[in-house]
C-alpha cells in the first residue's frame, strides 16, 4: 500500500494533524489527528510502498515493544488510515 498524495502532516501541540490539500484529495476540508507514534510511522512510509510488516518493524526498531503488541497496534492504525481514506492498496 501507499499513502495517498495530497496530505500534509503538521504538528499541533503534542499531536499531529494530517491535512488534506491539493487536487488529489476529494474533500480538502478533512483533517486527521495523529499521536507522535502514528505521525512517525506516516513520515517513514510517506510516498513509499509499505505493508503492515514494515510498520511493525519500524515500531520494534524504535521502541521497546513486543512483536505481538506492535502487530495489534499496526492493525488498529491501518484500519483507521483506511477508514479515513489516506492510504491506497496497490
Give short role names for the model-derived ranges.
Residues 1-43, 90:
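Acidic, low-complexity/disordered tracts enriched in E/D and polar residues
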Residues 30-90:
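Long, charge-rich, low-complexity alpha-helical segments
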Amino acid at each position: 500500500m501507499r499513502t495517498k498524495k495530497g496530505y500534509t502532516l503538521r504538528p499541533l501541540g503534542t499531536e499531529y494533524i494530517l491535512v488534506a490539500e491539493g487536487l488529489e484529495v476529494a474533500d480538502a476540508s478533512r483533517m486527521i489527528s495523529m499521536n507522535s507514534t502514528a505521525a512517525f510511522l506516516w513520515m517513514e512510509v510517506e510516498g513509499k510502498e509499505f505493508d503492515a510488516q514494515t510498520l511493525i518493524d519500524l515500531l520494534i526498531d524504535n521502541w521497546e515493544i513486543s512483536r505481538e503488541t506492535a502487530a495489534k497496534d499496526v492493525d488498529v492504525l491501518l484500519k483507521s488510515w483506511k477508514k479515513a481514506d489516506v492510504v491506497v492498496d496497490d
